[in-house]
C-alpha cells in the first residue's frame, strides 16, 4: 500500500475541534454559515476551516511531509443565530504562520479566497476578525492618524467639515478649481474629488491637481486656516498612482485620496507607505463596498473591511451617516467607527463586535459621514460621531440657493453652534432643531439653508438587526 488512506475526507474529523484553546497569536474569524439542507453545522463549520486553510478535497500523500496540526485552521465553536433557522456563527482559528507579514492581500486570499464558492454551503458571510497583536505589529497602518492630522491642520475640539465637488463628472479643471476655492473660502476644511474622478478626457489629473492646489492656497491665504482638497490618486496601475501622489507632494498639498477596494489592498498599502514617508494625509473612499457587504447572509461585513483598511493604511474612511438611514444601524455603525478610532475595543455582540481587539498603538482612522446630509442633521451628526470625525456635505453645500461660499458658511455656522451648545451642556438629541434655529437668527446663510432643507425627526431608539 501507499502508507496513507486514500479517499474523500469527512472534514469534521480533522477540522472541528470544540476543545481547542485559542492562542494569543491566532487570527480568529466569525463566519455566518448557512449550510445546504442536510449538511450538519459541524461539518459546514469544519469545511470552512479546512477550505480557508490547509484542506483539500481528498487525502494527498504530501500531507505526510508537513504537520497538519501546526498549520490547519480549526472550527472551535458553533452557535445558532437566534431568529434564523439553519444559520450558525462558526468561529475559526488560524495559526499565524499561515499568513505573510504585513500583507492584507494575503490575509484575505487565505481567509475568504476560495471558501465562498463552496458547494456544501448555501451562503457564507465573514462577520468579524480578531487580528492578533503579533500580526498587527507587522503593519505600518495609517500614514499619520487622528492626533498627527489635527496637529498638521491646527484644528481641535470639533469635527472637520468637507464637501464633495459636484457635478462629479464633466467640469473642466478650471471650473472645478473655482468650486473648490469657493467652498474652502466659505468655511469648510476640506473639499473632495469624487471617487470616480480619476483622469478622464474632460479633466486630466494633472490639470485638476494644479487648479485645486491654486484654489486651496488662495483660500488659505484669505482665511488664515489650513485647507485641503482630497486629490484622488487612484489610477489604472500602481506606478501611475504613485506618480500622481508624487506630483501632489511636489505641489505641497496636505492630502491625497484613494479608492481602496477598487484600487486593491496592495496598491493601497504602497500608497499609505508613500504618504507616511512624504507627509501626505490619505483619505480613503470605499467605492464597491456594498458589492461585498450589503447582503446580510453572504459576503463580508464592512467592519472587516474597515479593520483591514486600518492595517493597510488610511487617515480617513467613509463609514456611513447613521442619520436618515434604516434603524438598527446606529449601534452597529458606531461599533466599527470605534474600531477605527480607538486603541482598544471590547467584545460587544450588541454592536456587532465579535472579538475584543487591541490595536497596540496603531494610529486611528477618522470616520467620514457623507451622503444626503444637510444643516438640520448637524446636531445628530455631532452627537453620534463626536469630535473625531469628518462630516461631508456635497449637495448640502453646493445646493445652497445663494451659491457655494454661503453654502459652506451655513455648514460651518451650524457646526460651531452645535459644538458650542454641547460644550455648554445642552442635549443635542433633544434640542437640536432649536439650536440650529437659534444660530440661523444671526446667520442669513444658515437661515436660507434651513428653508431649503427640512427639519428632521431625530429618533434615537433603534431596532437592532444583528
From Swiss-Prot:
Pfam families listed in its UniProt record: RuBisCO_large, RuBisCO_large_N
Protein family (similarity comment): Belongs to the RuBisCO large chain family. Type I subfamily.
CDD domains: RuBisCO_large_I (cd08212)
Key words of the record: Calvin cycle, Carbon dioxide fixation, Chloroplast, Disulfide bond, Lyase, Magnesium, Metal-binding, Methylation, Monooxygenase, Oxidoreductase, Photorespiration, Photosynthesis, Plastid
Catalytic activity field: 2 (2R)-3-phosphoglycerate + 2 H(+) = D-ribulose 1,5-bisphosphate + CO2 + H2O; D-ribulose 1,5-bisphosphate + O2 = 2-phosphoglycolate + (2R)-3-phosphoglycerate + 2 H(+)
Function description: RuBisCO catalyzes two reactions: the carboxylation of D-ribulose 1,5-bisphosphate, the primary event in carbon dioxide fixation, as well as the oxidative fragmentation of the pentose substrate in the photorespiration process. Both reactions occur simultaneously and in competition at the same active site.
Residues annotated as catalytic: 166, 285
Processing after translation: The disulfide bond which can form in the large chain dimeric partners within the hexadecamer appears to be associated with oxidative stress and protein turnover.
GO cellular component: chloroplast
Protein name per its UniProtKB record: Ribulose bisphosphate carboxylase large chain
Subunit structure as annotated in this protein's UniProt entry: Heterohexadecamer of 8 large chains and 8 small chains; disulfide-linked. The disulfide link is formed within the large subunit homodimers.
Main location: plastid
Sites of N6-carboxylysine modification: 192
Biological-process GO terms, alphabetical: photorespiration; reductive pentose-phosphate cycle
Modification N6,N6,N6-trimethyllysine, positions: 5
Highest taxon of source: Eukaryota
Binding site for Mg(2+): 192, 194-195
Subcellular location: Plastid, Chloroplast
Cofactor binding mode and count: Binds 1 Mg(2+) ion per subunit.
Site (Transition state stabilizer) location in chain: 325
Gene Ontology molecular-function annotations: magnesium ion binding; monooxygenase activity; ribulose-bisphosphate carboxylase activity
Broad EC category: lyase
Listed cofactors: Mg(2+)
Claim: Transcription is one of the keywords in the record: no
NCBIfam families per record: PRK04208.1
